[in-house]
Amino acid sequence: MVNIMEHRHVISALVLNKPGVLQRISGLFTRRGFNISSITVGITENPQISRVTIVVNGDDKILEQVIKQLNKLIDVIKVSELEEKKSVQRELCLIKIYAPTESAKSQVIQYTSIFRGNVVDLSPESLIVEITGSEDKINAFIDLVKPLGIKEMARTGITALARGPKILKPKS
């Protein structure tokens, strides 16, 4: 039976940009038995600091535990949950779609246009499409093109920032 109180949480953490930090974060999740749905890491406007965006599924108790444990790690500067309505959350997906005919290519291009995506590569038998947006938008596009034949796919996982003036920044 699925716990109805369980839902997706997006956690943003500022960490020192140095070797081993991601390993310590993922090790924390492994030791605690928490599953990471997606994780993205990239440098911030300060090259000494990286932003880690982690998506976990669980109830509020799990979220609280994850945030407490992350805050205990020495290289973690600050941690915050990014609520869906109070943040901008995006994912990038590259999809290689089977399209051996002009008709199939035209159909893929039309779908891509509707989803405001881009065709980034074209070969005699396939196209590579770039779709950026919410997880739901990307899943809808995948469902639409699946009957055509997805040859290969890569997703980045979610990255996010708080809306408005709220900023996740190190304490001064």
Swiss-Prot record:
GO CC, any one term: cytosol
Keywords associated with the record: Amino-acid biosynthesis, Branched-chain amino acid biosynthesis, Transferase
One biological process term in Gene Ontology: L-valine biosynthetic process
Cysteines joined through disulfide linkages: none
Domain ACT: 10-84
Record carries keyword Iron: no
Known catalytic reactions: 2 pyruvate + H(+) = (2S)-2-acetolactate + CO2
Top-rank lineage group of the source organism: Archaea
Enzyme class: transferase
One annotated GO molecular function: acetolactate synthase regulator activity
EC number from the UniProt entry: 2.2.1.6
Pathway: Amino-acid biosynthesis; L-isoleucine biosynthesis; L-isoleucine from 2-oxobutanoate: step 1/4; Amino-acid biosynthesis; L-valine biosynthesis; L-valine from pyruvate: step 1/4
Matches recorded under Pfam families: ACT_AHAS_ss, ALS_ss_C
InterPro entries: Acetalactate_synth_ssu (IPR004789), Acetolactate_synth/TF_NikR_C (IPR027271), Acetolactate_synth_ssu_C (IPR019455), ACT-like_dom_sf (IPR045865), ACT_dom (IPR002912), AHAS_ACT (IPR039557), AHAS_small-like_ACT (IPR054480)
The keyword Amino-acid biosynthesis belongs to this UniProt entry's keyword annotation: yes
Subunit structure: Dimer of large and small chains.
Similarity comment: Belongs to the acetolactate synthase small subunit family.
Protein name (record): Probable acetolactate synthase small subunit
Gene designation per UniProt: ilvH
